[in-house]
Amino acid sequence: MTMEVSKKKGGDFQQCHELIPGLPSELALECLVRVPFQFQSAMRSVCRSWRSLLSDSSFIQERRRCGKTELLLCLVQPLTPPIPASKSVDETLMVDEKKSEDESHPRVFCTPRFGLSVYNAAMSTWHRVAFPEEEQIPLFCECVVLQDAGKILLIGGWDPETLQPTRDVYVLEFAGRKWRRGAPMKESRSFFACASVSPTKVYVAGGHDDQKNALRSAEVYDVEKDEWSSVTPMTEGRDECQGFAVGMGLRFCVLSGYGTESQGRFRSDGEIYDPATDSWSRIDNVWRFPDTSPRGRTAGDFRSSSTLWCFTDTDLQSERRWETNDDSRNLKLDLQSIQLPMTGSSVFAGSLGGESVVMIGGKRESEGEGEGGVMMKMTTEKKMGKWSHHVHIPCDFSTLPFSHASIYV
């Protein structure tokens, strides 16, 4: 038994009441770890011992041991539907030019609010995570998971009131179901690369500042110390780049992006950071779609392989597969372009527990009936992608996500 129910870390759970009256603690624990995740909020209100048990990080380890963990896909997405066609852009954004002396930026009203949506793959259910009433989720923030720590982080993005890049960090403790403020980044940034590269570290790089300048800078967040540290900057400024962990999850890859003077023309190369040497290596010929951002169009399981799936609207007969190495020759990426199986009003690709999934939006409300969308999983057979497992997305959750992460609970 990997978890003691009679003794909690810190010594404040030395003697607990019976978890289930009349049952030995070990047997009671075997029952409680089998309760589906969706009912665990209600379990917390039953008694203090249950609340303490569910708040302990080792509870998820017991669920994992019993094979009862559930996979959640977490999505940062707008809460409001797309702008109606009859309404002009000028009507949707209203800027208050009457600034007080201590305001460095005007406040912007009527911008869409963002939320954190969750799809439970085991139960095929959708719900939205409550956020503190006095706060708002930053627009276009990055969502990243630290699985072993049981935490979801929302990093950077735009301030909802000023639409300026922010340094803010919000941490959701899944065990206690509580939000807290994390230490802010050293530099404000949005549309940057972000990934967890070890059980306790999150790296960010690139993006742009409040003047739309592409950034070279990079930082690392230590979740245990709740602090940020600067690392060696990249050789190129990269706005709208994509980040992921490679090399068995030990290095940080920043894919494509564009410079300040070439906005909208996405680079074909990338850079890979090695924490062991605090240095970057370059990887060429990795992104062959200069008119398309890699954000929301790539997926892969880089913890155990080096394959990157690139999802496209058309079938690229001559460029279906290619491979490339970084200039240190320490890492090889195998890339494959996959044509999307259907079209829709929006497309977002990502990873769900190491498998590739694509969310395709349906009709907009202004086009008539709201159809929601569909999510499809791609399985790999003989190194070829095959679509399966169609999941209907309710209308309330079918807006285009900006970032995502998946976590076992």
Swiss-Prot record:
Any matching Pfam family: Kelch_KLHDC2_KLHL20_DRC7
Gene3D superfamilies found in the cross-reference section: Kelch-type beta propeller (2.120.10.80)
Kelch repeats: 98-148, 151-199, 201-248, 251-300
GO CC annotation terms, alphabetical: cytosol
Entry keywords, A to Z: Kelch repeat, Repeat
Annotated F-box domain residues: 17-63
SUPFAM superfamilies associated with the record: F-box domain, Kelch motif
GO BP term (any one): negative regulation of cytokinin-activated signaling pathway
InterPro entries: F-box-like_dom_sf, F-box_dom, Kelch-typ_b-propeller, Kelch_1, KMD1-4
Listed CDD domains: F-box_AtAFR-like
Name of the protein described by the UniProt record: F-box/kelch-repeat protein At2g44130
